[in-house]
């Protein structure tokens, strides 16, 4: 087993099964579903920065291209539990030791969608595990924001929602593939949100537009996101990764320009450290009862979401959109 998945031997090799669900249940990591049947099975771990050229199941991997490191995190449906967020943080911090630029790639199907709602719904300690999950996400994002010795880039080549959008906005630069869809809001899940969004979103689009995006809960394309200043560049889907590579390497082509950026970043973070941390602390203060109180709307909306209890009609906010 590895990172919630199980490996089964076959006639001609082996197959990794990452998720399962019992009848009338919800999809969960395979080891969660089979926990009583796989006692004693050893965990076959990989290094935090696994070389993705080797063919096996992995959740976190990296690729180095000169002074640019690409960090991939292939979490199912873009959802990230506490343990995954912690591992990703450690992988990011390890790559900082040898890279000048770190590019966050995300997963094959989604960039990221924030905390892991299915695992929280399955938990016997929903408040405690939800609180742990959001704080682990915040620790990851703090590590990215305060990485004052590298340039960080997020690559939105797949859709992102809620905390996953704000994970991307934690980076110095944000680029995306054309027609990728972003949902930069939390309210439809009964949450006010954290992940430093009250710092990163207004920083890019201004307070008025940030409030509008969070309140209206509408999706927007990467093209629209660039137009309002939320992201920096949009590349064509036909040559996206070539464009991404050129963009990342261009950030270190001029050594003097790179050094100036790092110096300015260090000064900015030092001057704004208290403000940035205060943003997160205020977010968490508001979120606390949303996780812990039994009457919190989050519990009902999360249940409906994971059990796919859809509305009988299109929400008003999406009609005609």
Regions found by a protein language model. Give the residues of each.
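Hydrophobic/aromatic residues within transmembrane alpha-helices
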Residues: 104, 167-169, 225, 287
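Crotonase-fold acyl-CoA enzyme core
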Residues: 146-149, 153-162, 170-181, 185-259
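A structural preference for short, pocket-lining loop segments at secondary-structure junctions
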Residues: 66-73, 85-128, 139-153, 179-181, ...
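Long amphipathic alpha-helix in the N-terminal Rossmann-like dinucleotide-binding domain
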Residues: 133-136
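An anion-binding loop in the catalytic cleft
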Residues: 1-57
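STAS-typified acidic loop motif
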Residues: 48-87, 108
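C-terminal long alpha-helix characteristic of the crotonase
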Residues: 231-298
